[in-house]
Amino acid sequence: MAGLGRLDPGPRTVMPAWKREILERRRAKLAALSGGPGSGAAPDGPNERLVLAESLGPLSQNPFMRLESERRRGARPAQQLLELYCRVPGVRTIRADNILIIESAPGFPPAVPPASSIRAAEVVVYEEPQPGRVSRLLEKFDSPAAPRRRGSPERFRPALPQLPVAPASAATRAPTNRSLAPAPPVLPSQPAPPISPVPVAQRAGQRSACCEPAHPDGTAGPGARRSDFLQKTGSNSFTVHPRGLPGSAVNRSLSNGPMTQESPAGPANGLSGSPPVPGKWKPKVESKEPSLHPPPSPGTPSATPVGPPAFLAPSPASATPSQRQWVSSATSANDSFEIRPSSKPDMETIPIGDLQARALANLRVNSRNSFVLIPKRKAPGNYPSAAGRQFEEPKGEVGWASQSQGLGSQLVSTVDGAPALEKSSLAAEMQWAVREGGCPRPAISDTDKSVRRQRPASPPPFLPATTEAEPAEGLGVPGLTKNGQEPVRPGLPVTFIDEVDSEEAAFQEAKLPSSAVGVPSQYHLHPSTPGHTSELLNRGSNTFTVVPKRKPGTLQEPHLSQTNGQFQQGAEEQDADSLSGPHTTLENALKKRYPTVNEIEVIGGYLALQKSCLIKAGSSRKKMKISFNDKSLHTTFEYPSESSLAQEEAEEEEEEEEEEEGEDGEEEEVGPDSEKSFTVLLPRATFVSSVGPESSSGLSSYTPKHSMAFSKWQEQTLVQAPTEVELPPKEVMLTPASQNDLSDFRSEPALYF
């Protein structure tokens, strides 16, 4: 036993302490991983195991993983919230990178309780989306060729027998298959028609409507009858008109029948009552264009609903369809909405904590072009005249129109949301502006009454100038009453459109008295628009020059004349210029515009600059400039040597009286039109535009090379007169000595202080 006791500590004494500690740590790690306690672990074994357990831990408790999961979880509802609010009528959404501003449209009516029964004027049938990734990609990118080829009304003939012979079980099974639509099943009391009743599947939480059975005469030829009842409305949806499309006078009289005013969304697709006669206006499908309602991409802040196309944001140029279809002076009255100058908001009434409201109000305060778009409604019985005028109502108000007026008494033109018409409609509005001779009025392209989005910082397309004499009539008088139009009815949602000018003149206009006549002074044309440019800066037959440096007199006179409502006189002068260069004006209008300091407000308590200290053009700047030649910066200036400077200091004591007399004489010689330089002592180096023989650049001044020829400048630096007339040290200052020198400094690349 004694020998065994001696053999046991033998290896222990041979093994070093550091090696024994490593082994103990290894045993502790193995015990922690296997779950059992280590038999030969040292006293620090359990501590080591606890440290490992705390450092690793489960991944669900990792703080980094937890933050990442919370970020993903928070980003998902933001996208869903954006898409949801974009489809809600009466709500305007403005989305930036990480900001979503949601505000209710003013004057939008309250929600209507669901109706017990609805007599449908049209039925919207949605096809089941194809399963798989390919269909989702097709829906995301919305390729228009495949859906039109598959489900367009003209090529939908093979599927005709499926509609009349559809079993009743399919109609009752449809609500259960479509979980997105809480549609009640078809009423069993209704008789079975040739076309089985199909529930209207409405997504995004909107209530689905149970409609009455339709009774088209399905016994006729399928090709002849299908085009009268079907209309393609999207990649996977089409519209069934039970009473038929308005192809004849009988259908038109039938479609003007009464309709229950309790429909919350009105008929789908924005067609209230009966669409106009196909001779006047044809849907998008018949003109072989992309589908009427393309489903928006999930990542884009589109206001177009994915589900029922009852509330759609019109395309940028579709605010006035009559002007898009018939470009003539007969349709220039713009009977769908009215533009009025908007008043500036009161910043004192906005609470300080509401940063978003203050930012929007500041944008409107600093904008030169602020509009209020007020939709107009015709009285019952006023149909479009023979000239082709149509009345368009915003999509967000179709449901309300069905409550306040009979839907059969209105004609609402369907506005397509496809961006393919932007170029053609923009050219049409340009042509309209040329024919009218008026100044195209800029406005933000999206003139939807229920959704407001911010456009990128580029000059927007032109909105027709329909309110030529509005500012003179004041805010209370509608600008279109002179054309015989009815006044605006109360309760309609209006849209405010603000356009911030890119120059300093925005603040000059904001300083003008705006309460004199009751008209805001910022209501005038954008100075960079083609109409304004051709009026002020037309240099040739078809050349329009944009010069940012402009005197305040020439800048404010046309603005005042336009504010007083004198648009027609400028329109007559610009008619020939607009006719000669429409392409140039369009090119100038679509140039990229960068935001200026006037458009940027630092939210967070730093500073909101009213003007830039580095702005290039402006009437209130100081005349001090620093000019450099960009090509020869390294050899532009030459400073005197130390020896010549010491020699100059010795001569200063002898010639103090001559210096004062020479300074007076030099000030008399330099006039407003003479090109002379002035000299200051170092280190206050002066900036000379040109050098005359009287005052050469000597020891205490330098001469820029670009102001004269290089040979003369070289000779002048070699032959420097030591007895140079100089300023006394007490007159060293930042500004020039004489005020007459202010007009001598002109150079293009300059900094203004």
From Swiss-Prot:
Pro residues: bias regions: 182-197
Amino acid composition bias (Polar residues), ranges on this chain: 230-239, 250-263, 323-335, 559-571
Q: Which UniProt keywords apply?
A: Actin-binding, Cell projection, Cytoplasm, Hearing, Nucleus, Phosphoprotein, Protein phosphatase inhibitor
Where is the stretch described as Disordered? 141-348, 438-488, 544-583, 637-676
In Gene Ontology terms, what is a biological process of this protein? sensory perception of sound
> Can you quote a single GO CC term?
nucleoplasm
**What spans are recorded as compositionally biased (Acidic residues)?**
648-672
Its Gene Ontology molecular function terms? actin binding; protein phosphatase 1 binding; protein phosphatase binding; protein serine/threonine phosphatase inhibitor activity
Q: Domain of life here?
A: Eukaryota
Which residues are recorded as modified (Phosphoserine)?
274, 402, 458, 502
Composition bias of kind Low complexity appears in: 300-322
**Chief location:** other
Q: Where is the composition biased (Basic and acidic residues)?
A: 337-347
Compartments in which it is found: Cell projection, Stereocilium; Cell projection, Microvillus; Nucleus, Nucleoplasm; Cytoplasm
Under the heading Pfam families, the entry gives:
Phostensin, Phostensin_N
Q: What does the function comment of this entry state? A: Essential for hearing. Required for maintenance of stereocilia on both inner and outer hair cells. Necessary for the integrity of the stereociliary rootlet. May act as an actin cytoskeleton regulator involved in the regulation of actin dynamics at the pointed end in hair cells. Forms rings at the base of stereocilia and binds actin filaments in the stereocilia which may stabilize the stereocilia. Acts as a strong inhibitor of PPP1CA phosphatase activity. Recruited to sites of DNA damage and may play a role in DNA damage repair.
Q: Quaternary state and partners of this protein? A: Interacts with GRXCR2; the interaction restricts TPRN to the stereocilum basal region. Interacts with actin ACTB; the interaction may stabilize stereocilia. Interacts with CLIC5. Interacts with PTPRQ. TPRN, CLIC5 and PTPQR form concentric rings at the base of stereocilia and may form a complex. Interacts with phosphatase PPP1CA; the interaction results in inhibition of PPC1A phosphatase activity. Interacts with DNA damage response proteins XRCC6/KU70, XRCC5/KU80, PARP1, TOP1 and TOP2A; these interactions recruit TPRN to sites of DNA damage where it may play a role in DNA repair.
Q: Which family does it belong to?
A: Belongs to the taperin family.
Could you identify this protein by its name?
A: Taperin
Its organism's taxonomic lineage begins at: Eukaryota, Metazoa, Chordata, Craniata, Vertebrata
